[in-house]
A protein has these predicted regions:
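Conserved donor NDP-sugar-binding/catalytic core segment of glycosyltransferases
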Residues: 69, 109-145
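N-proximal low-complexity "stem/linker" segments adjacent to membrane-targeting elements
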Residues: 1-27
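Short beta-strand-to-loop acidic/aromatic patch adjacent to the donor-nucleotide binding site
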Residues: 94-109
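Non-catalytic, C-terminal membrane-associated alpha-helical segments of glycosyltransferases
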Residues: 215-290
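Conserved nucleotide-sugar donor-binding
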Residues: 154-169
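Acidic donor-binding segment of Leloir-type glycosyltransferases
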Residues: 23-69
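Catalytic donor/gating beta->alpha subdomain of glycosyltransferases that bind UDP-sugars
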Residues: 171-237
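Active-site-proximal specificity loops/subdomain of glycosyltransferases
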Residues: 58-98
């Protein structure tokens, strides 16, 4: 039975969240053989916190990148990519065996058997290439599921089968790299799944790190960059507009229109563009058939 994994965590100015996240991983019933925390040029106590834990846990390592403004598009994927490269190179150099590759953001709390349960799901179904837990948020003292599609693994609390990770070109330096990874996995015959019974609590919605409007506007520009069919954009607008605080849908639509008016460059990967132009619409159509 496969079971060893490596873990990557990107962190920038996370002194308030990181200690609890680290404790969550230390308490795991199945710990990673190697955990790389990538300090993205933090200006708070994040580096000191990580250094202290690394001194006490030999399977934890830190790498530090130069200071850079917070950026949830290209730079985030670059930070994660650097962590994955370092982790794989370290395992190869030290002859560490691993079967899976995991990503956990520095603001995501997980239960002590989180990764063990995901690994069990993978071992039960060898066709699964990418899985994640369900993403929940604390809203007015309640833990609320974000309602994401069960076939789309989340970006955090995420686990790749090693062979799937490399077959899908690893973690590409692109906006929404988790979405690209999901698509490439499906196009290569892998199954993907988000398990809402395996709980991951995200302390903040990734899109809201710089405010709802800016976060969803970036999502809209990314939709244009991916060459999403206008019907998919309309579905996204409606979905983001029917839930409190309601206005993010307009930010999303505004971002898409910005990309269209500015004739922003689109992604060069033809299979991603074809997926969002054609296959994704067919998937929606299949789901609404009676």
């Amino acid at each position: 039975m496969c079971g060893e994994y490596i873990l990557i965590t990107p962190a920038k100015n996370e002194e308030c969240n990181l200690p609890e996240v680290i404790e969550c991983v230390i308490r795991q019933t199945k710990k990673p053989v190697l955990w790389i925390i990538v300090d993205d040029g933090s200006s708070d106590k994040t580096p000191d916190i990580v250094d202290d834990y690394c001194r006490r846990n030999s399977w934890m390592k830190k790498i530090t990148l130069p200071p850079h403004p917070r950026d949830i598009t290209y730079h985030y994927s670059y930070v994660c990519s650097e962590g994955f490269k370092y982790a794989v190179d370290t395992c190869n150099a030290l002859d560490f065996h691993f079967d899976f590759i995991a990503l956990l953001d520095a603001d995501t709390e997980i239960g002590q058997d989180f990764f063990e349960e995901l690994i069990e799901k993978m071992n039960d179904n060898q066709k699964l290439g990418i899985v994640s837990g369900g993403i929940y948020h604390r809203i007015q003292d309640k833990i609320v599921f974000n309602g994401a599609d069960e076939l789309l693994p989340a970006g955090t609390g995420r686990l790749w089968r090693k062979s799937c990770f490399f077959e899908t070109e690893g973690y590409l330096i692109e906006p929404s790299p988790d979405s690209i990874s999901n698509i490439k996995a499906v196009l290569r015959g892998w199954e993907t799944k988000q398990f809402d019974t395996i709980v991951a609590i995200e302390r903040r919605d990734t899109r809201t790190a710089e405010g709802y409007w800016k976060g969803y506007r970036i999502d809209g520009r990314t939709a244009y960059y991916f060459d999403k069919h206008p019907l998919l954009v309309l579905i996204g607008f409606i979905n983001f507009s029917v839930k409190s605080p309601f206005y993010p849908g307009f930010g999303y639509l505004f971002g898409y229109i910005q990309g269209w008016l500015g004739k922003t460059e689109k992604i060069g990967d033809p299979e991603i563009r074809d997926y969002y132009r054609n296959r994704r619409l067919r998937e929606y159509a299949e789901r609404v058939k009676f």
